[in-house]
Design a protein with these regions (language model features):
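Mid-to-C-terminal alpha-helical segments outside catalytic/metal-binding sites
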Residues: 2-48, 56-59, 63, 69-110, ...
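Active-site environment of divalent metal-dependent phosphoester hydrolases
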Residues: 68-70, 119-121, 161-162, 190, ...
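Active-site-adjacent C-terminal substructures of enzyme catalytic domains
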Residues: 237-241, 254-258, 282-283, 288-339
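Generic enzyme active-site microenvironment
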Residues: 213, 263, 331
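Histidine-centered divalent metal-coordination motifs
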Residues: 64-66, 215, 265
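Active-site gating/metal-coordination segments in enzymes
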Residues: 109, 114-250
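Active-site gating loops and adjacent loop-to-helix segments of metal-dependent hydrolytic enzymes
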Residues: 69-94, 123-131, 219-240, 277-302
Length: 372
């Protein structure tokens, strides 16, 4: 990420999303920003022209790949301008043609589309509007999936503000749009995914044997704990850990066994903190009525983790000590990070079978249609 990227706090009435929006350190006016968006996108969104295409084998499936419909981009610019929050250029300059060109240049066969942005689909304008924005984003991504056969899959974003409306969103995503899975945030305001209010939604997703991709946002509680850094550097991976622990301690993992969970950025800090969490809770967790019947580490080993911005040798060493490579998928966090992170994995000297499993095999096992 560009070293000039910064973050600005903004006052919000909405209790269901983070207090922070991230952007470049220099705040541009709406007119200046829109005038320069296309030029910015050409340099920031697309990869270096000197980058070489990746080899065809192994096939690459990017499981952590973001999209932003034009209507969403415009709404976010308005929302940020109202709060004097700087714009995040690569997000607002994203477009489908540039996305596909970048995939081609970097050997990405298929990308799983998901939404990742503060404030999600709720722009402080009511649950109904959030529901409508979720529908708009799902429709846009589903059209990309249809128009570019085989190049995209869809993790459908949900609003999560009203249980009945969210259940209808799930029905529409799976039954009408044929989504491949669901895209959730780690937190919605001051509630993480293990909160009891989300149990009816998760029970329905369990009934459908859904794949859930979970993307972190900086939580309300912790936006001011960044010790002078861009908040995403520290707080984003920690919020993945918070929501994983909330799902663990609430018994959600133990009770809803038919959900396949995919967590971002190598699981945040879970690989490093697994032993500490186990030391505090493992004895009370075990047993047929416990929240981790076979032990906490066994619960963590059932989850899936992507490699987005987590391909450093130390990070991968921790992750592969905790889980087998069968639980790891390739991800990039594009357009915020480059698409060529497979090179870092190649340098680790993984056995070819393990590299192929991460690159595509594990994801095609989760979503068989991607093997076509």
């Amino acid at each position: 990420m560009n070293a000039q990227v910064g973050a600005t706090a903004s006052h919000r009435e909405n209790p269901h999303h983070s207090r922070w929006t991230f952007g470049c350190a220099c705040h541009s006016s709406r007119r200046q920003f829109l005038a320069g968006a296309a030029a910015f996108g050409a340099t920031a969104v697309l990869p270096d022209k000197k980058a070489k295409a990746q080899p065809a084998a192994p096939k690459l499936i990017d499981t952590h790949h973001h999209f932003y419909p034009p209507a969403y981009q415009r709404r976010q610019i308005d929302w940020e301008d109202q709060r004097k929050v700087p714009h995040f250029g690569v997000q607002s300059a994203w477009n489908p043609d540039g996305d596909l060109e970048a995939m081609d240049k970097n050997g990405i066969s298929t990308s799983m589309l998901s939404l990742a942005s503060t404030p999600g689909v709720w722009f402080d304008d009511g649950a109904e509007n959030a529901h409508d924005m979720a529908r708009l984003c799902c429709d846009f991504a589903a059209e990309m999936v249809r128009d570019k056969s085989g190049r995209y899959g869809l993790f459908a974003p949900l609003s999560m503000l009203d249980t009945d409306a969210t259940l209808k969103e799930i029905e529409y995503a799976f039954d009408t749009l044929k989504a491949d899975g669901i895209n959730l945030q780690t937190n919605y305001g001051d509630k993480w995914l293990g909160h009891p209010s989300y149990r009816p939604v998760l029970e329905e997703l369990n009934r459908r044997k859904a794949v859930i991709f979970v993307h972190p946002l900086v939580a309300n509680c912790c936006a001011n704990l960044s010790v002078g850094t861009f908040p995403a550097v520290i707080e984003v991976p920690h919020d993945t850990t918070r929501t994983v622990v909330s799902l663990l301690l609430s018994g959600t993992f133990a009770k809803l066994r038919d959900i396949s969970w995919l967590f971002s950025h190598g699981g945040g800090t879970i690989p490093f903190l697994a032993g500490r969490i186990e030391a505090f809770y493992d004895q009370k967790a075990r047993g047929p009525n416990g929240f981790a019947p076979d032990g906490i580490e066994a619960e963590f080993r059932r989850l899936y983790y992507d490699t987005a911005n987590a391909t450093h040798p130390a990070a991968m060493a921790a992750l592969t000590k905790l889980v087998p490579t069968s639980q790891i998928t390739y991800g990039t966090d594009y357009p915020y990070f480059p698409l060529d992170q497979i090179e870092n994995l190649r340098k680790l000297g993984l056995p070819p079978a393990d590299l192929a499993a991460i690159a595509n095999g594990n994801m095609t096992r989760l979503i068989p249609r991607l093997s076509a």
